[in-house]
Amino acid sequence: MSERRFLVTGSSGHLGEALVRTLRRDGVDVVGIDIAAGPATDIVGSIADRGLVAEAMSGMTSVLHTATLHKPHIGSHPRTDFVETNIEGTLSLLEAAVAAGVCSFVYTSTTSAFGHALVGAREAAWITEAVASVPKNIYGATKTAAEDIAHVVHQDSGLPVIVLRTSRFFPEQDDNDRVRNRYRDDNVKANEYLYRRVDLADVVDAHLLAAERGPEIGWAKYVISATTPFSPDDAAQLRTDPGAVVARYFPEQPGLYAARGWSMFPTIDRVYINARARDDLGWQPRYDYRRILDCLAAEQDFRSPLAREMGAKGYHDEPTGVYTT
């Protein structure tokens, strides 16, 4: 198979559609599959349908597996649905990829899989790939289980598998009432770029690099989040006075925030570290807190063109509240 051919699962979702659009603009042959119809979806059906998946997998060189039930689905779907989609669906894709001779498999996971390990009691938790997961809900538990299954399939078959634990990149409002009531949405997202958010365009870049580097890497798991300005020496003060830490790194930040009526969070409980992804994949995320402040100073939208193009999709056909991932 000399020509690249991608199968993108979850192609009607936020990341999946962004991947399909990006690949098609680059002239790459790509097929989108999703349980819901959408402009980037060629095959409508479940990834747990092994016959459908085997047919869709034929001739593919790479799989970008973004399809999942997310945290917002916890209140609307039984646990069995999470097992069917996140575990059985992933296994179906992995085994079909092995049978089809796929060259690389990229699995979109989540930093939520770290679960209870994310919150540091006396100082901000420093979250790298070495931190052990302690799942706290069915979403995190099934994503972690699917990661482990992917590792087993890699060990048994040699299928190159790269797991990307992505931080927040959704455009929807935060699901925490206190956060929504106290801060403007753009204020929230700007703050999060310091420690727990990544732009959609950078997530797309990470997936495409993972697909490219997968065959030489074989197996790996990476944290995908904007590059933090912080160091481990900041961890204690981030828990008690993050505003002082941020102002030390960015002296212009207090003035830029004051001009908009914005404020920093009273505490930062974790920091995601992306160093391994940058080193191994050659990933160079472009959207970080430095860029956010530069955009604020220039009175420009700090989102990437791709993020603005995709907008918000939500997680339910009939929303009943605020949903995040």
Regions picked out by a protein language model, each given a short descriptive name:
Residues 205-269, 274, 279-280, 303, ...:
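Mid/C-terminal beta-alpha module of Rossmann-like enzyme folds, strongest
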Residues 91-136:
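Conserved Rossmann-fold NAD(P)-dependent oxidoreductase catalytic core, especially the SDR/UDP-sugar
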Residues 45-87:
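NAD(P)H-binding glycine-rich loop region in Rossmannoid oxidoreductase-like domains
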Residues 6-26:
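N-terminal Rossmann NAD(P)H-binding glycine-rich loop of SDR-like oxidoreductase domains
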Residues 172-187, 193-223, 227:
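Alpha-helical substrate-binding/gating segment
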Residues 84, 88, 120-161, 189-190:
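Catalytic helix-loop patch of NAD(P)-dependent Rossmann-fold dehydrogenases
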Residues 35-49:
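Rossmann-fold cofactor-recognition segment
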Residues 156-180:
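Flexible, glycine-rich beta-alpha linker
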